Each structure stands twice: as structure tokens, then as C-alpha cells.
Amino acid sequence: MITNAPRACLALISLLAGVALAAPALAQDAAPVRQSLDDAWWTGPILATGASTLPKGRALIEPYLYDAKPYGAIDGQGKRHAAPSADNYGSQTYLLYGVTDTFTAGLIPRSGYRRAGGRSSSGVQLGDLTVQGQYRLARWKQGGRTPTISLMLQETLPTGRHDRLDTRPNDGFGSGAYATTVGLNSQTYFWTPNGRILRTRLNVAYTVLGHAEVEGASVYGTPAGFTGRARPGDSFNVDLAFEYSITRRWVAAIDLAYQRDAATTVSGVDGAGAAYARRSPVSQALILAPAVEYNFSPVLGVIAGARIIPAGRNTTASVTPVIAVNYVL
């Protein structure tokens, strides 16, 4: 299954496109009825963040569960090579609150468990914690051309373990560094020829990371006895997402994303006191995330799909099955 991931991805994308394109042909003999916004319920795609803010006093809870499974290592020329099998189980939960109608704040806690190389984590491990604020700059109105636009600011705190992993190499789920992300999110609506709604999101974000003090074996590949620091590379991400309303409850969704991570540098001394320096190459990844949403009501829905990295440079080809529940209180 994993080795055929790119082929499966293309099949899923073809299915999503076919749903949108086939419907007009079935309705040639009758004028399509334009779907109303009230008749379309959404959870949101797997990756792209919404530009809308919560109404004042409302809250959102959205837990994600996933398992990142590598199926190849992609080198600097974009060629894929075999990679050891592994399971990287994880969870992250969006806990958001509408402070005002135009400002939403929240937390994103993370945790994980890994099985790789014949060894497992000693238990469920905490990851880094993100604090988030989002301010809405513009709001889409039906008949208008301006999308909903918001400015997002995130600060990720290094709460997860990242070093001193000499006896438990699979316990590292943190970076050890503070990370500041600035993003611009937009969202708008289109009506397809058959009258159904196509909701579209565009996210652009840049993340600046600080230094991490490192001792011993770490997530940066340092050996036992090492003392020094690591500087993770800054990251740029752009994500274009589409959601097609099949019925009021059912939605087909897909994210098309690109991520570039700058080089990570590590410097210090090893256990023998000799100088130790490493620099990882710049990595790039093409990310696809097809999914299906089912909404029980306008405030409760579930989404299931996969985050797939089929191509890139100096990255890991992987398939990550994902399921999430979206609930607005």
C-alpha cells in the first residue's frame, strides 16, 4: 500500500475532480439550482487554516489523530530511495476561543508515540506547545470580490523533549527552540456550473526558529556525549485548499501545499572533546492532502484523509492517515 502511495494519491485527486466535473453533465437538461450557504456545512480541510474568526464567546475544539509512515527518502536530486519502516503516531488539538468577533486566540498542544528501528517510545510523549492569535482584517460578503483575510501569529514553546535521548532515541518529540510564525490566511466561495459551492482557502506562512541547547543524543542526530547547540532552519509554507460541497453533509476536500525548510546547523564538541559540526541541506516538499468530510450539523463534523509527500528535495516521502473531529461550542 505504501509503495503505491503516489498512484493512490492521483486516483484520489481524480475522484475529487470527477465529482465536481461530472455533475454539470448530469444537469444539462435543467437549470441548476444555486446552492445556498446555509445548505453547506464544513469542517475545513486537513491542513489549511480558516481565515474566519470565531464569534465572541464561542469556542472550537478540533483534535487530530494521525500516523506518519515513511515510504522513501528523497535526495537532493529528487530521487526516491528505500527508507526503514516506522510508525509516528501523533495528536494535536486546536483549542480556540473567540475573544472578540474579529480576534480568536488559542492553544495547540501536541503529543506522540514512535515505533522505529525495532524500538519504541517509552510512552506517549509531549510535543511542543503552540500559542496562537488570529485577527480578521476583511470579511467576505456574498456578491463581493474581497475574500475573508486574517493575520495569524503563533509562538511555539519548546515543551517537548529534544535531547538526552541516549537510551530512548524515540522519545524526542520537541525541537528545543522557540519558533515564531507569521501567516496570512484567506478564504472565499465560488459556485460551480452545477450550482454547488466550492470553498477555497489560501495560507501563506513563514516561521523563524531560535537556537536549541543540546546535550547528548538528540532529534538533531547528535551522538552521546555531545554538548553544543542547534539552529533549526526557518520554514516557508504555502497551502491552497479546495472544499466541494457534494451535499449539505458530505464534502470532498484537498490541500495542495509546498514547504521549504532552510538548512539546520549543529555545532559543539563530542564526548571526546573534539569539535563537532554538521549542516543539513535545504529541504523542499510537495504536500497533497485529499480528504472527505461528513458534517452532523453546522457545528459538528468529522474529516478523514491522508497527508502525502510524494516529491521534493532532501525530505522523506510519507503517507500520513489523518482523522479529526471539529466541534464549535
Question: PLM features: what roles do these ranges have?
Answer:
Residues 26-72, 141-148:
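Outer-membrane beta-barrel biogenesis signature
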Residues 32-38, 66-92, 170-171:
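Surface-exposed strand-loop-strand hairpins of Gram-negative outer-membrane beta-barrel proteins
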Residues 68, 72-81, 215, 224-329:
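Outer membrane beta-barrel transmembrane domains
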Residues 52-54, 97, 135-137, 155, ...:
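Residue-level signature of outer-membrane beta-barrel architecture
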Residues 50-58, 102, 139-149, 191-198, ...:
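Short loop/turn motifs that connect adjacent beta-strands in outer-membrane beta-barrel proteins
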Residues 87-91, 122-131, 147, 174-180, ...:
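Residues that define the transmembrane beta-barrel architecture of outer-membrane proteins
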Residues 59-63, 105-107, 131, 147-153, ...:
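Transmembrane beta-strands of outer-membrane beta-barrel proteins
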Residues 65-71, 109-115, 137, 155-161, ...:
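Transmembrane beta-strands of outer-membrane beta-barrel pores
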